[in-house]
């Protein structure tokens, strides 16, 4: 991870969005890589620079179009000397995963997860990346940023966030400008301003290389010093701002859009370096720790609101404390606000005691133990400390400092900062004013030269690296099994810490019984004999434990985790809850009403609509999404029905999965003593909805397509979301190597054929992919699927581009070799964690696959694959198929005539795709 301590806060007021699109350009190469002939490319790029400056200062529409045509023309000429995405190709050769970057208010961060034997090559690559970045292929990348902006214009949540910050920070760039930038500024970029920004902020005293993993820190530090020695320290002008004036008055604003209604309340607080930041974190957890906070118990568990949360966003100069809530049916947003503020008032009055703080600190300690096991989490922790100007040792000791904080300080902070000086944003449902989307400029596709390689890349690829062999783990050997009564105990000992994870895994899931979906939400709201729901939540939280009910398609998990010292207590209380749950018809009735409200809200959410439509496109009207209780069936449900279902779990065949420090024999003894086990491992007696003769894997049949078809759902938005689906052959373990290699080459990441053609060359989408998706259930078919999210005015171009790639596969032996080597490198260096053994064993056994991971047959097969194998796979499984398209778009932007070009059109209602 490489963090630069600069973000949108530092954007020039005349070029907002600059930090963000500079982040995009840091993937385009330097004068040494990304170029076929720098001497010929450079003068053309200088011409483009000058044209953009002229374009910026021209207001006449016809002259601007003429200038942009010139930019487009010269860009095509310059692209003949460019090699697109050589950075991503090198990352692929490393075996890197998660290659990405992001920009926020105070930071720009570049991320890679690399094999430990590739650290030296990665440092060579990054040192060159930041030496002299070249702003090539700019106008097509800017189109991707336009798409990102248009996506934000469709998101009600983004509008709320922007309005909140604009009102909280009247004199600070946190509120005066956004990370994505204004439409006007995005349409008038300045390459000169980008270079000036880079030269000012991308300097060694404003950057940090942050690493966590298996390496020698002293050796790496010396290598960093040598390879980045070209960088020169310079003075950086600090961002200067005037302290925001305090206004002891609530100010409220409306944001209107098609998504569900909600309330957001924001308070301006001091920055992350202060003691007040710790107080804010403690108050956040007192209110909302997801188990036993004031909001959790009094608003969510007591069913006063549909949902409610608190949160803190800490930045370099200020922080923001937020409360959010969604109304129940018939509730006003003003009532939601009052309920949220009522819980905050408890903090202001000091209505909490030391035991609550002790429980919070214990749970935070447990959270840190889990978090700091993960390399990525460690890096983000160090990154946050660096960006916010906190010594990492102080940040690491944050918990100890919070233990020393007294109650009076917390109460004083709440009264001083979480008071009337607040902003309330009411997100109301309705038609918003038509967003000023960025229209598609007239540009032409550029050459990518993907079959070419710069001299730098050739030399870099030839750099040696220490070989690492994969570590094969036989899951049947590392997972110890024994019978505990009639149940199988799967056991793995935790030798790292004193935390346990226990799961009861039942052979009964939501595909067996639609009503099963009510168990988890009901059990969060009720208690058991002698214990209220609040009592149970407080007890688990006091112990640092969590319990969860979660449904799968063909199984159901009930789990607990926490410190070993409370294992027996947690097992006992969970079993009490499972076997003696309260029958509360009032809670059940209100739960049903909340589910109905959530269902109505889902129909307003474009992501939920897209997911539902995708299921319909794959399976038809009977699919996993519509496999649900109707609203009428739901309203007839009673608490006694849910309780009967839950009590029946003790008669269902299940396994007991344990990962923790306790010895296996002791775990078995506890389970036999405290957990209700079936007399025999028989199946559940409750009726299977479609008849007991039908197997769950045959419940839903993927549609067999004989002709192209289009399913369409209308949603008022700037973007059009387009999915492709085609049912292929039954999943087969022996095809793992070819399918994985195909995906890596064709559509799996930023260096893939799909991404390079649709986004990089043609600038038709911000997000796009295409993969051959292996089935997750035995004997089920694989699915070829693709996706493009694009502006409605690029609709036909985007579909045409994807269809072209699905029909004919561009061939490049060098790029395929890199893709193949990337997979081999990952298999050699990735390691399965002990806490993952049991879950992996279940998955492999259910699929009928080898229980040794990684798949050593796949590892042996990968080196022998050739480009011709990928071409053959594409011809047989991908090309010429009658794809089903699932499209969510605004019918005023995408007409029926537009849709009918791609097959028989079926417009579906929300009721049809959701099943209610």
Which ranges hold each PLM region?
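Proteolytic maturation boundary segments
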Residues: 216-256, 262, 297, 359, ...
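A common structural junction motif
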Residues: 128-136, 228-235, 341-352, 576-583, ...
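Short, conserved secondary-structure transition motifs
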Residues: 146-154, 243-257, 360-372, 560-564, ...
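Short, conserved charged micro-motifs
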Residues: 119-122, 217-221, 275, 331-335, ...
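M16 family metallopeptidases and their MPP-like homologs
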Residues: 1-11, 17-18, 35-128, 159-184, ...
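Active-site-flanking alpha-helical
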Residues: 2, 23-27, 31, 524
């Amino acid at each position: 991870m490489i963090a630069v301590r600069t973000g949108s806060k530092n954007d020039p007021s005349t070029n907002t969005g600059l930090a963000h699109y500079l982040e995009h350009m840091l993937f385009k190469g330097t004068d040494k890589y990304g170029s076929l002939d720098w001497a010929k490319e450079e003068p053309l790029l200088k011409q483009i620079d000058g044209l953009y400056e002229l374009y910026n200062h021209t207001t006449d529409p016809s002259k601007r179009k003429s200038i942009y045509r010139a930019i487009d023309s010269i860009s095509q000429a310059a692209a003949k000397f460019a090699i697109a995405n050589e950075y991503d190709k090198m990352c692929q050769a490393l075996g890197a995963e998660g290659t990405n970057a992001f920009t926020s208010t105070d930071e720009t961060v570049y991320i890679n997860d690399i094999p430990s034997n590739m650290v030296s090559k990665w440092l060579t690559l990054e040192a060159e990346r930041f030496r002299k970045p070249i702003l090539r292929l700019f106008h097509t990348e800017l189109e991707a940023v336009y798409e990102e902006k248009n996506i934000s214009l469709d998101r009600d949540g983004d509008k709320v966030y922007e309005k909140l910050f604009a009102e909280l920070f009247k004199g600070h760039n946190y509120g005066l400008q956004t990370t994505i930038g204004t439409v006007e500024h995005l349409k008038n970029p300045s390459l000169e301003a980008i270079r000036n920004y880079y030269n000012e902020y991308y300097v060694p005293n404003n950057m940090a290389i942050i690493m966590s993993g298996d390496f020698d820190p002293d050796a790496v530090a010396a290598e960093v010093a040598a390879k980045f020695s070209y960088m020169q320290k310079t003075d950086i002008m600090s961002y200067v701002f005037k302290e925001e004036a305090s206004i002891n008055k609530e100010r409220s604003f409306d944001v209107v859009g098609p998504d569900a209604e909600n309330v957001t309340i924001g308070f301006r607080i001091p920055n992350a370096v202060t003691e007040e930041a710790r107080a804010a974190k403690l108050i956040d957890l007192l209110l909302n720790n997801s188990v036993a906070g004031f909001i959790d118990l009094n608003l969510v568990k007591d069913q006063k609101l549909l949902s409610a949360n608190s949160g803190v966003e800490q930045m370099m100069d200020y922080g923001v404390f937020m409360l959010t809530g969604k109304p129940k049916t018939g509730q006003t947003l003003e009532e939601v606000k009052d309920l949220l503020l009522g819980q905050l008032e408890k903090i202001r009055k000091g209505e909490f005691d030391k035991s609550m703080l002790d429980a919070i600190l214990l749970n935070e300690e447990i959270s840190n133990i889990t978090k700091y096991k993960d390399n990525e989490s460690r890096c983000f922790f160090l990154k946050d400390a660096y960006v916010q100007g906190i010594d990492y040792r102080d940040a690491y000791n944050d918990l100890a400092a919070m233990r020393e904080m007294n109650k009076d300080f917390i109460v004083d902070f709440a009264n001083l900062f979480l008071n009337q000086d607040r902003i309330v944003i009411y997100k109301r449902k309705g038609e918003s004013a038509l967003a000023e989307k960025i229209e598609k400029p007239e540009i032409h596709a550029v050459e990518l030269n993907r079959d070419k390689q710069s001299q730098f890349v050739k030399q870099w690829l030839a750099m040696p690296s220490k070989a690492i062999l994969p570590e094969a783990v036989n899951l049947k050997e590392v997972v110890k099994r024994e019978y505990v009564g009639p149940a199988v105990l799967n056991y793995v000992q935790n030798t790292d810490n004193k935390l346990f994870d226990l799961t009861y895994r039942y052979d009964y899931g939501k595909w067996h019984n639609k009503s099963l979906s009510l168990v988890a939400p009901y059990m969060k709201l009720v208690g058991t004999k002698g214990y209220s729901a609040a009592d149970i939540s407080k007890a688990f939280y006091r112990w640092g434990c969590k319990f969860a009910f979660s449904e799968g398609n063909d199984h159901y998990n009930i789990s607990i985790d926490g410190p070993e010292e409370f294992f027996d207590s947690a097992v006992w209380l969970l079993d009490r809850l499972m076997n003696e749950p309260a029958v509360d018809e009032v809670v059940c009735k209100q739960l049903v009403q909340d589910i109905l409200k959530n269902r109505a809200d889902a129909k307003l959410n474009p992501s939920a609509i897209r997911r539902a439509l995708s299921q319909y496109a794959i399976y038809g009207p009977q699919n996993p999404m519509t496999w649900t209780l109707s609203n009428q069936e739901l309203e007839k449900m009673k608490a006694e029905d849910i309780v009967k279902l839950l009590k029946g779990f003790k008669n269902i065949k299940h396994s007991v999965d344990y990962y923790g420090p306790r010895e296996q024999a002791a775990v078995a003894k506890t389970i036999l003593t405290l957990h209700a086990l079936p007399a025999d491992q028989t199946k559940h007696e409750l009726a299977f909805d479609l008849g007991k003769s039908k197997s769950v894997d045959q419940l839903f049949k993927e549609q067999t397509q004989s002709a192209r078809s289009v399913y369409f759902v209308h949603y008022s938005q700037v973007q059009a979301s387009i999915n492709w689906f085609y049912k292929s052959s039954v999943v087969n373990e022996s095809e793992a190597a070819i399918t994985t290699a195909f995906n890596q080459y064709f559509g799996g990441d930023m260096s893939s054929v799909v991404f390079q053609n649709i986004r990089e060359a043609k600038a038709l989408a911000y997000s796009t992919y295409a993969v051959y998706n292996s089935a997750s259930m035995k004997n089920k078919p694989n699915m070829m699927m693709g996706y493009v999210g694009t502006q409605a005015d690029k609709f036909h171009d985007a579909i045409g581009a994807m269809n072209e790639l699905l029909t004919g596969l561009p061939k490049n032996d060098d790029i395929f070799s890199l893709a193949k080597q990337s997979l081999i490198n990952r298999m050699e260096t990735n390691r399965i964690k002990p806490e993952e053994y049991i879950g992996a064993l279940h998955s492999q056994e259910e699929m009928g696959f080898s229980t040794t991971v990684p798949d050593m047959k796949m590892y042996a097969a990968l080196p022998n694959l050739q480009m011709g194998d990928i071409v053959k796979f594409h011809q047989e499984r991908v090309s010429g198929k009658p794809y089903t398209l699932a499209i969510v778009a605004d019918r005023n932007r995408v007409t029926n005539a537009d849709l009918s070009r791609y097959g028989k059109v079926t417009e579906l209602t929300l009721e049809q795709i959701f099943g209610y």
